[in-house]
């Protein structure tokens, strides 16, 4: 293995060491993914579509579940899978950039991805982005090497980790045709790559009664977020924000320095049709589609996690712009890129406020707002095995990581966010503990007492953003 590649991998591993040990599962729906995988691991079987895997790709859940069975620890299993995917992603991006733009471009692309705060977070939690990116880049490298069938298999697998992988099937087909001018091979590639998606659509039609059930769920969620943005900022401002969202997000995901250099290099390569220009098209055509939906149709709200492919492929072209800088400026640029993950971590770790909540989704370490972890620890330390715990839902979804971090068995929870079986669980068990969180639906977490359907709870421990209540002692008056 070449020394520059080893250096890039060493940087990547070092940057992920602390987050993988000290971070928390939160963004990328990591807690839910791990819980679903853990259920599957108890009884491995063919997923029954949306009824069991919800909106998540079944391959990612299966891989986590298999590692849970092998290792016995759900968090270790999920993080080991993500770390492997993260390091493979750095290695594969190096190989893609080396093939298209040379050794220097390969080194800087790999180093930039190693410093990417979002990629660090995805490599150190149970989220799916690092695994997806590794499969995507593996498929791309094989396609560039004209190993069409293997490339199609990997891209098909990527689409079963994250459904946005399906968008790249026709784009890869077009890429192969542009490079090889062999229509039959391009069509064969698309057929093989699309087969897993078609099978999964059939599974959903068979068991859920709707082939597109997972996609409809995702569309509903993003349409709701888009409406919330329009209501909050106004239609015009929301459209303008969505119009520039993708390039601005890339400048955060890839660090501001390398993100900007990658964008400049990508524009130059596309305008001059330099080697690799077609990779720019593969990276940015999906971005154009999502931008159209967000800015024109107002039915989609983009997230930084969606930009990881565009950011990674743009880094292939960062070296050209970096090479134009004088040596002191280059050193300063690299130092700024290395400092970006640390700065984002300091903005949100154990902090509250608007800046902390802005930084948290893209920071290198998975973090929770202060008080949520403490509340989870209190519940874990004080809940008895016969306690039934009522857990409030939250518009910030803080109930999900709180329950996950506590490690309390699922059967003890009565979670208001679980609309499907909330009433059934209440009918079976009377809650003896309750946890209210900020912006919850059941009650005000700042109050000393909490009345739920005639059951009176008294505050046992208060935290920032959450309060734990226990059933009031007999004879307690309101």
Give the residues covered by each predicted segment.
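Perimembrane helix-loop-helix junctions
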Residues: 145-149, 155, 168-194, 201-202, ...
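Transmembrane alpha-helix segments characteristic
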Residues: 7-13, 113, 155, 190-194, ...
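Membrane-lumen/periplasm interface segments of specific transmembrane helices
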Residues: 15, 185-262, 287-290, 343-350
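Short periplasmic/luminal acceptor-recognition loop of GT-C membrane glycosyltransferases, typified by
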Residues: 369, 373, 377-415, 434-439
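Hydrophobic/aromatic-rich transmembrane helices and adjacent perimembrane loops
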Residues: 122-123, 129, 158-161, 167, ...
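Signature aromatic-anchored transmembrane alpha helix within multi-pass, membrane-resident enzymes
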Residues: 5-10, 153, 170, 190-194, ...
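Multi-pass, polyprenyl lipid-linked donor-dependent membrane glycosyltransferases
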Residues: 28, 55, 77-85, 108-138, ...
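Specific aromatic-rich, kink-prone transmembrane helix
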Residues: 89-95, 112-115, 131-150, 154, ...
């Amino acid at each position: 293995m070449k020394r520059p590649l080893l250096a890039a991998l060493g940087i990547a591993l070092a940057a992920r060491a602390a987050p993988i040990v000290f971070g928390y599962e939160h963004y990328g729906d990591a807690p839910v993914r791990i819980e679903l995988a853990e259920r599957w691991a108890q009884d491995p079987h063919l997923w029954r579509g949306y009824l069991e895997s919800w909106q998540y790709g079944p391959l990612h859940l299966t891989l986590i579940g298999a590692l849970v069975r092998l290792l016995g620890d759900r968090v270790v299993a999920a993080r080991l899978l993500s770390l492997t995917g993260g390091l493979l992603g750095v290695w594969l991006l190096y190989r893609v950039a080396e093939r298209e733009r040379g050794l220097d471009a390969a080194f800087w692309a790999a180093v930039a991805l190693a410093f990417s705060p979002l990629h660090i977070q995805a490599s150190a939690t149970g989220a799916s982005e690092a695994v997806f990116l590794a499969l995507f880049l593996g498929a791309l490298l094989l396609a560039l090497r004209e190993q069409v069938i293997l490339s199609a298999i990997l891209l098909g697998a990527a689409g079963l980790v994250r459904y946005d992988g399906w968008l790249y099937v026709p784009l890869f087909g077009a890429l192969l045709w542009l490079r090889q001018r062999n229509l039959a091979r391009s069509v064969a590639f698309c057929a093989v790559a699309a087969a897993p998606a078609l099978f999964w659509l059939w599974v959903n039609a068979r068991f859920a009664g709707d082939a597109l059930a997972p996609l409809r769920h995702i569309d509903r969620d993003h349409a709701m977020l888009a409406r919330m943005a329009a209501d909050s900022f106004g239609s015009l401002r929301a459209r303008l924000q969505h119009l520039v969202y993708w390039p601005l997000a890339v400048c955060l995901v890839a660090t501001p320095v390398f993100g900007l250099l990658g964008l400049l290099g990508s524009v130059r390569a596309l305008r001059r049709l330099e080697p690799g220009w077609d990779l720019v098209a593969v990276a940015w055509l999906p971005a154009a589609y999502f931008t159209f939906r967000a800015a024109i149709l107002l039915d989609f709200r983009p997230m930084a996690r969606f930009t990881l492919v565009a950011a990674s492929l743009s880094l292939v072209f960062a070296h050209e712009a970096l090479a134009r800088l004088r040596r002191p400026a280059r050193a300063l640029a690299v130092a700024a890129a290395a400092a970006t993950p640390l700065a984002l971590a300091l903005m949100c770790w154990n902090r509250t406020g608007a800046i902390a909540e802005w930084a948290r989704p893209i920071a290198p370490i998975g973090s929770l707002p202060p008080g949520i972890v403490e509340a989870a620890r209190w519940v874990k330390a004080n809940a008895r095995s016969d306690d039934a715990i009522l857990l409030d839902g939250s518009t910030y979804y803080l109930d999900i990581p709180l329950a996950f971090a506590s490690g309390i068995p699922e059967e003890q929870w009565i979670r208001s966010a679980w609309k499907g079986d909330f009433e059934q669980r209440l009918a079976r068990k009377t809650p003896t503990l309750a946890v209210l969180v900020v912006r919850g639906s059941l009650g005000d977490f700042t109050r000393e007492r909490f009345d739920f359907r005639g059951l009176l709870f008294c505050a046992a421990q208060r935290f920032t953003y959450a309060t734990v209540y226990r059933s009031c002692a007999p004879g307690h008056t309101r």
